[in-house]
């Protein structure tokens, strides 16, 4: 074997990572350069990156008409005016302004209802694409590249979490709607902190892990202070200010990375994982007494509850152990070694066990939350009333009668499949129990192999329509959400390839074989992949290639599809998944960016049209409709999870995501703009609504930093009500200011 081949084999993953990073940088450089090329002004010494409005022609004192002037045009001439002056408002495939104003007056309300309904559907779709498809591929890619969990959390998963907000922001900037872009970032953070977190608090009081809470809320507070000092103070951003925002996020990344070294994770991959009300993540494991003490054991376990099981690896349990170096913990090196050896001897699916786990988690999955809630209540009705704060000391026995004999069909978001007939041991839970005693009790019982509970091969219909599984047994609102999600899931299943690899904790000590990414699991459907060979190329050329002869482009796409179908049909087995299957996640990564960008462009086009129709400021639309819409799936998913009895999970990703979105969305955009324009400052038009939102968001964060520690890190309905009041008052103030502005 030559030295070159040995080198490529040894460093292939590093090379792939470098290629992926270069491609990603080039892609965004191209997108950002196009965006700022259209908004940069060479007639002024400063770069008016986000400024937009009516100007006067000094030569003849005539007002330059814009689309917003359509309100001054008679209804009979509004259609012609829209065709002449509103073409720039259409950022997507459809011109919604023309669609509305070229409709007769008697039908404009139904047309407006169609536009609003389409907007709601797009918001749901962009949330599903990010959480259930795009983020899943990112997790698989990180597994293939052997990246540590802490690095994955602040890179790949951060990208997946913030993809709708970041891509929507760039889509708004590209069409000169900077006010909408900044408004979306601040409004989304305000909505998530006040409404999403407040909803979780209202549903079920619980105790929150102090370390993650203080870290994330403190850094988000610092982010808002930077925005107030740099952006809202004088309406401009210099290069050094942009660099400070970027470096501040890097500081957050480093802090997350190094603060994660206080714990050790053990990952157990079990084909017969039994989600008995989520054993590892269950609030039963997080019972606290009323004392002031908040042990590291409780903290670490509760912090692990921040992971949504459907977004972790399929049928993978993570158990978080206490730091060996912590003198307050009695977890000896002997016990550590014993557990380590046990996993290696009994778990044939994982040869990498120990890892440090920290950092931001994947955004909550809307589909997973819906399915998880219905499955959890169906299988364990007796556990619905468990309160995270009021678990009494004593024994908890799981009897076989609590478990129904059912096996879930394969679900794209990775819902774990329950099994039946497993009698869990009688486990004693108390506030004084140590983690190692609990884990030792669990490990004392034998595990089950794949042969004990073979899973049937998934049918094509179950793969194409997973939200309709157990449809008759769901509540009315779950049925409504499932029906609304059917078109989106069907489209993405056909045109966005995804592979959910078992997410094993990464430790550089152990070697990982990529073939372990597809252990004999029934996640392979050749029929589905054959259909994807048709729809994936079609979606790629439709949404990514502009210009040229469309007939030739689609003909080339058809030829490529035929070649892929032929190769897949003759060189793959009907039952056994091919070894290259995990690598389709790279294709899904590219298609995910294309899909989310396309949907974001369409959303921006609709919002701009609504601004013209109702004569609303773009910043108000960004702060309210745009922000709430992009966070809609998060709100629904977190409410479902909290109502299922796991509010810790629902609260997990509330504070980390906005930090990334604001710092990267504003910092990198303004920095690149300044560099491209000879170091000039970026001037940003700041309406009063942006300042009002920023200060109310800061008030919410200060309330959390004061109230939660004083309440011994318990969040309750009083806190949720206060957050709701702040959001209602802040939003109402913005609307009143906007209405009074034109009077």
From Swiss-Prot:
It is found in: Endoplasmic reticulum membrane. Its main location: endoplasmic reticulum. GO terms for cellular component: endoplasmic reticulum; endoplasmic reticulum membrane; membrane. Keywords: Endoplasmic reticulum, Ion transport, Membrane, Transmembrane, Transmembrane helix, Transport. The chain crosses the membrane at residues 13-33, 109-129, 138-158, 182-202, 213-233, 239-258, 528-548, 551-571, 580-600, 609-629, 649-669, 690-710, 718-738. It is a multi-pass membrane protein. The keyword Cell membrane does not apply. PANTHER family: MITOCHONDRIAL SODIUM_CALCIUM EXCHANGER PROTEIN (PTHR12266:SF0), NA+/CA2+ K+ INDEPENDENT EXCHANGER (PTHR12266). Belongs to the Ca(2+):cation antiporter (CaCA) (TC 2.A.19) family. This is Putative cation exchanger C3A12.06c.
């Amino acid at each position: 074997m030559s030295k070159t081949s040995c080198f490529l084999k040894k460093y292939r993953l590093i090379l792939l990572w470098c290629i992926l990073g270069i491609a990603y940088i080039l892609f965004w450089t191209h997108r950002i350069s196009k965006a700022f090329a259209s908004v940069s002004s060479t007639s002024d010494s400063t770069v008016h990156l986000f400024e937009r409005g009516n100007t006067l022609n000094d030569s003849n004192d005539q007002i330059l008409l814009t689309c917003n002037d359509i309100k001054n045009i008679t209804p009979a001439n509004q259609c012609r005016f829209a065709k002449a002056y509103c073409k720039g408002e259409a950022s997507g495939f459809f011109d919604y302004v023309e669609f509305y104003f070229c409709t007769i007056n008697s039908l404009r309300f139904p047309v407006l209802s169609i536009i609003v309904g389409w907007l709601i559907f797009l918001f749901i779709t962009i949330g599903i694409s990010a959480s259930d498809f795009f983020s899943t591929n990112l997790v698989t890619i990180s597994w293939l590249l052997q990246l540590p969990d802490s690095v994955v959390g602040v890179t790949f998963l951060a990208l997946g979490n913030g993809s709708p907000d970041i891509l929507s922001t760039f889509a708004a900037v590209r069409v000169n709607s900077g006010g909408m872009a900044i408004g979306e970032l601040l409004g989304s953070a305000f909505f998530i902190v006040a409404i999403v977190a407040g909803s979780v608090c209202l549903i079920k009081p619980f105790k929150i892990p102090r370390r993650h809470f203080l870290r994330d809320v403190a850094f988000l507070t610092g982010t808002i202070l930077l925005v107030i000092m740099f952006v809202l103070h004088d309406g401009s951003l210099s290069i050094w200010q942009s660099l400070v925002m970027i470096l501040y996020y890097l500081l957050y990344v480093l802090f997350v990375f190094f603060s994660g070294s206080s714990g050790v994770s053990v990952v157990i991959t079990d084909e017969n994982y039994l989600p008995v009300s989520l054993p590892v993540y269950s609030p039963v494991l997080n019972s606290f007494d009323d004392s002031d003490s908040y042990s590291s054991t409780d903290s670490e376990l509760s912090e692990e509850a921040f992971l949504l099981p459907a977004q972790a690896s399929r049928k993978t349990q993570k158990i978080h152990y206490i730091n060996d170096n912590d003198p307050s913990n009695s977890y000896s090196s002997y016990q550590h070694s014993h557990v380590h050896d046990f996993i290696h001897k009994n778990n044939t699916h994982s040869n990498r066990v120990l890892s440090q786990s920290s950092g931001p988690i994947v955004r909550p999955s809307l589909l997973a939350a819906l399915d998880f809630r219905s499955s959890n209540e169906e299988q364990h009705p007796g556990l619905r009333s468990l309160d995270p704060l009021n678990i009494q000391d004593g024994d908890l026995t799981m009897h076989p009668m609590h478990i129904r004999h059912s096996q879930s069909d394969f679900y794209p978001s990775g819902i774990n499949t329950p099994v039946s007939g497993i009698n869990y041991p009688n486990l004693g839970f108390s506030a004084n129990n140590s983690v190692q005693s609990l884990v030792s009790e669990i490990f004392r019982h034998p595990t089950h192999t794949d042969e004990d509970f073979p899973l049937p091969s998934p049918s094509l219909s179950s793969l194409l329509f997973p939200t309709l599984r157990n449809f008759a047994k769901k509540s009315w609102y779950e049925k409504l959400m499932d029906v609304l999600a059917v078109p989106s899931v069907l489209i993405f299943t056909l045109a966005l390839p995804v592979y959910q690899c078992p997410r094993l904790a990464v430790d550089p000590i152990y070697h990982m074989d990529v073939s372990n990414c597809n252990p004999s699991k029934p996640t392979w459907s050749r029929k589905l992949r054959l259909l994807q060979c048709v729809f994936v190329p079609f979606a790629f050329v439709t949404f990514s290639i502009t210009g040229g002869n469309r007939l030739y482009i689609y003909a080339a796409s058809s030829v490529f599809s035929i070649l892929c179908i032929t190769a897949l049909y003759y060189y793959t087995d009907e039952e056994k998944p091919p070894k290259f299957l995990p690598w389709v996640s790279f294709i899904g990564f590219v298609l995910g960016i294309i899909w989310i960008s396309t949907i974001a462009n369409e959303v921006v086009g609709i919002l701009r049209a609504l601004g013209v129709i109702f004569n609303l400021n773009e910043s108000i639309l960004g702060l309210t409709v745009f922000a709430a819409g992009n966070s809609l799936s998060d709100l629904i998913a977190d409410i479902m999870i909290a109502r299922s009895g796991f509010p810790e999970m629902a609260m997990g990703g509330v504070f980390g995501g906005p930090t990334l979105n604001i710092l990267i969305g504003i910092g990198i955009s303004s920095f690149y703009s300044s560099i491209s324009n000879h170091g000039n400052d970026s001037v940003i038009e700041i309406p009063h609504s942006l300042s009002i939102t920023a200060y109310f968001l800061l008030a919410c964060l200060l309330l959390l930093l004061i109230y939660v520690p004083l309440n011994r890190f318990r969040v309750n309905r009083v806190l949720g009500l206060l957050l709701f009041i702040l959001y209602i008052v802040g939003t109402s103030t913005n609307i009143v200011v906007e209405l009074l502005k034109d009077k």
